[in-house]
From Swiss-Prot:
Cellular component GO terms, alphabetical: cytoplasm
Entry keyword Cell wall biogenesis/degradation: no
Spans annotated as 21 X 8 AA approximate tandem repeats: 52-223
Modified residues (N-acetylserine): 2
Gene: Sprr3
Comp. bias intervals (Low complexity): 163-175
Matching Pfam families: Cornifin (PF02389)
Protein's GO biological process: keratinization
Keywords: Acetylation, Cytoplasm, Keratinization, Repeat
Predominant place of localization: cytoplasm
Function per UniProt: Cross-linked envelope protein of keratinocytes.
Protein name (record): Small proline-rich protein 3
Region (Disordered): 1-67, 110-238
C-alpha cells in the first residue's frame, strides 16, 4: 500500500503540471505578438510615418522635380539658346564684319595708296632729283675749278717769265713740265667725267663719290708743289 501510494502521486502530478505550463505559454505569445504588438501598432506607428516622411517625400521631391526641373529645362535652356544664340550671331557678327571690314578696306587702303604714293613719288623724286642735283652740279663744280686753277696759274707762272729771259730753253721745260700734267689733269678728268655722267646715272652715289675726291685731291696738290718750285728755280737761275 505504501509503495503503491507513493508511486501514484509521483506519476500523475507531473502530467498536469506539464499541461498547465504549456497551455499558458503557447496561447499568450500568439495572441499578444501577432495581432497587437508586432503587426498592428508597429506598422501603424513606426513604418507609416517613416514611409510617409522619409521615402515618400524624398522619392517625390528628388526624382520627380529633379527630372522635370533639372533635365527638362537644362536641355531646353542650355543647348537650345546656346546653339541658337552663340552659333548664329557669332558667325554673323564676328566673321561677317571682320571679313567685310578688314579684308575689303585693307586691300583697298593699304596696297592702293602704297602702290600709288610710295613707288610713284619715290621713283620720280629720288632718281630725278639725284640725277639732276648730284650729277650735274658735281661735275660742273669739280672739274670747273680744277681745270681752271691748275693750268691757268701754271701757264701764267711758268711761261710768263720764261719768254722774257730765254724763249727756247724756257718754253721747252714749261711745255714738258706744265703742259703735259696740265693736259693730263684737265683732259683726263673731263673725259672721264663726261662719260661717267652717262654711266653713273644708274649707280648714282657709288661711282660719283669714289673717283671724284681721288681725282680732285691728287692733281690739285701735285702740280702746285712741282711747278712753282721749278719755275722759281729757273727764274732765279736765269
Amino acid at each position: 500500500m505504501s509503495s503503491y501510494q507513493q508511486k501514484q502521486p509521483f506519476v500523475p502530478p507531473p502530467q498536469p503540471e506539464q499541461h498547465q505550463v504549456k497551455q499558458p505559454c503557447q496561447p499568450p505569445p500568439q495572441g499578444k505578438f501577432v495581432p497587437i504588438a508586432t503587426s498592428e501598432p508597429c506598422h501603424t506607428d513606426v513604418p507609416q510615418p517613416g514611409n510617409t516622411k522619409i521615402p515618400e517625400p524624398c522619392s517625390t521631391k528628388v526624382p520627380e522635380p529633379g527630372n522635370t526641373v533639372v533635365l527638362e529645362p537644362d536641355y531646353t535652356t542650355m543647348p537650345g539658346p546656346c546653339s541658337t544664340n552663340i552659333t548664329e550671331p557669332d558667325y554673323t557678327t564676328i566673321p561677317g564684319p571682320c571679313s567685310t571690314n578688314i579684308t575689303e578696306p585693307d586691300y583697298t587702303t593699304i596696297p592702293g595708296p602704297c602702290s600709288t604714293n610710295i613707288p610713284g613719288p619715290d621713283r620720280t623724286v629720288v632718281p630725278g632729283s639725284c640725277s639732276t642735283n648730284i650729277t650735274e652740279p658735281d661735275y660742273t663744280t669739280i672739274p670747273g675749278p680744277s681745270s681752271t686753277k691748275i693750268p691757268d696759274p701754271g701757264c701764267a707762272m711758268v711761261p710768263g717769265p720764261s719768254p722774257s729771259s730765254t724763249s727756247e730753253p724756257s718754253s721747252e721745260p714749261c711745255s714738258i713740265n706744265v703742259r703735259e700734267p696740265g693736259y693730263m689733269n684737265a683732259s683726263e678728268p673731263t673725259h672721264a667725267k663726261v662719260p661717267d655722267q652717262g654711266y653713273t646715272k644708274i649707280p648714282d652715289q657709288g661711282s660719283s663719290k669714289v673717283p671724284e675726291p681721288c681725282q680732285s685731291r691728287v692733281p690739285e696738290v701735285c702740280p702746285p708743289t712741282v711747278t712753282p718750285v721749278s719755275a722759281k728755280q729757273k727764274t732765279k737761275q736765269k
